[in-house]
Amino acid sequence: MPSNLIEVILNRFMSYLITPEGYKPLLDLKQTELGIKQIKEFFQLNLSSELRLRRVTAPLFVLKGMGINDDLNGVERAVTFPIKDLGDAKAEVVHSLAKWKRLTLAEYHIEPGYGIYTDMNAIRADEELGNLHSLYVDQWDWERVITAEDRNVEFLKEIVTRIYAAM
């Protein structure tokens, strides 16, 4: 029987994962963490250069009812908590930054051809757990100002090519 709460939680979450029979990881835990760090640093530098993006810090939570936290498919329940010094106003952990990114582009007066990126952290309480999804989200998110003329398939292909070049 697990000796502490963390072990209980990990064992429960691990039951959702599918591991191929005989699987042996190539890296240990420390090597994996170092690899994640190196990949994130490399990609951050290259993506920002390729797409002309500036880094901005994403909020971990926003005030409920502000219309900033996107409801991805209409059924997500945001993780909420009261903020004591704001009269127990409810805050929500973000699960999507789509609206926030557009507000931020305007706030920073970003010109066409430039944009922003962030390393978003979120909690998605209603995520279906498995090899591809977890409760905790750590993902890159970016947005770029484009002109009406750029709204075409050729421009989209150019952006995709630049993203691949960043990798």
Predicted regions and their residues:
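A conserved active-site cap/scaffold subdomain adjacent to cofactor or substrate pockets
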Residues: 152-157, 161
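Metal-assisted phosphate- and nucleotidyl-transfer catalytic regions
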Residues: 16, 162-167
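Class II aminoacyl-tRNA synthetase-like tRNA-binding/catalytic domains
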Residues: 11-133, 141-145
